[in-house]
């Protein structure tokens, strides 16, 4: 994307007509975003204009978007499964396809009372599950301190706790054998394919949230191996993965002693492997 664009404040509208000023400002924002390659320039312009509190803030938001910052990071929030989630630079932006993971969790464990969001990023999955399930004991964990800080804000309304550390090492020991839903949006992009990702992800999101190792399954293997010790009887592990990795992910779950099931949403291009505790 180009580093400069027409300023949204520059227009020849009659300043005595507020509606004309507003229309001219929107048009200028749309032009700037479209020139930068934003496919949904009109929708993005409306979101920026609704979020910005001052013309200066609006111009700064447009400039950041033109420079390639993801829209969600520009406005500071993302809509996820009906929940507005706070996001900030350096944090993985929740994807719409991951809503399918939440749907699968709710379908298979609608009465879960203990929920863990592993590799939580902003805590979007945990917040969405808590919003749908009602009062639950909610924990989230991530290795990235920036993500944990963001997750704490998003989980506060649900009484949730976010912990910093490496996977299960971050969780309170008292959760062992008690978790009804263990959701893990693990990184699953093979290392060699990270440079091929869109610039918005490659340049503005943490590598730890994207890079899944040589075949994209390094973190998934560790999560599957550790999950049985943490799941309650009848508890479930849910992990999002890519289409190519899905068959191997199912095998990993089975080798870990879980009963696996692959669910696919073709519209969202989402693949979720669910592992059911057998004990």
Question: Language-model segments: which ranges?
Answer:
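Conserved AdoMet
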Residues: 2, 42-108
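Intrinsically disordered, low-complexity terminal tails and inter-domain linkers enriched
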Residues: 3-24, 169
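Residue-level signal for inorganic ion chemistry
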Residues: 48, 68, 98, 125, ...
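Conserved SAM/SAH cofactor-binding pocket of Class I
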Residues: 100-196, 244
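Class I S-adenosylmethionine-dependent transferase superfamily signal
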Residues: 105, 129, 201, 223-227
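Conserved SAM-binding loop
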Residues: 140, 212, 238
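Mobile active-site "lid"/loop adjacent to the S-adenosyl-L-methionine
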Residues: 188-219
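Conserved Class I SAM-dependent methyltransferase catalytic core
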Residues: 215-276
């Amino acid at each position: 994307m180009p580093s400069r664009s027409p300023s949204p404040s520059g227009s020849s509208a009659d300043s005595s007509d507020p509606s004309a000023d507003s229309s001219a400002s929107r048009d200028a924002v749309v032009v700037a975003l479209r020139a930068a390659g934003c496919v949904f320039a009109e929708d993005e312009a409306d979101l920026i204009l609704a979020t910005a509190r001052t013309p200066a803030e609006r111009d700064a938001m447009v400039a950041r978007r033109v420079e390639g910052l993801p829209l969600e990071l520009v406005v500071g929030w993302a809509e996820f499964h009906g929940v507005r989630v706070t996001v900030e630079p350096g944090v993985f932006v929740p994807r719409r396809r991951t809503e399918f993971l939440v749907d699968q969790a709710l379908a298979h464990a609608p009465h879960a009372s203990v929920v863990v969001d592993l590799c939580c990023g902003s805590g979007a999955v945990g917040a969405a599950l808590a919003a749908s399930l009602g009062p639950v004991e909610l924990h989230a964990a991530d290795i990235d301190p920036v993500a944990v800080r963001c997750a704490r804000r998003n989980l506060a309304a649900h009484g949730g706790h976010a912990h910093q550390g490496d996977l299960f090492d971050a969780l309170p020991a008292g959760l062992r054998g008690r978790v009804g839903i263990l959701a893990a949006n693990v990184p699953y992009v093979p290392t060699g394919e990270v440079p091929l990702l869109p610039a918005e992800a490659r340049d503005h999101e943490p590598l730890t949230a994207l890079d899944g190792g040589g075949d994209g399954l390094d973190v998934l293997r560790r999560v599957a191996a550790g999950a049985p010790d943490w799941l309650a009887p009848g508890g479930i592990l849910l992990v999002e993965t890519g289409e190519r990795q899905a068959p191997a992910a199912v095998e990993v779950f089975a080798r870990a002693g879980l009963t696996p099931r692959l669910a696919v949403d073709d519209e969202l291009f989402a693949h979720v492997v669910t592992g059911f505790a057998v004990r």
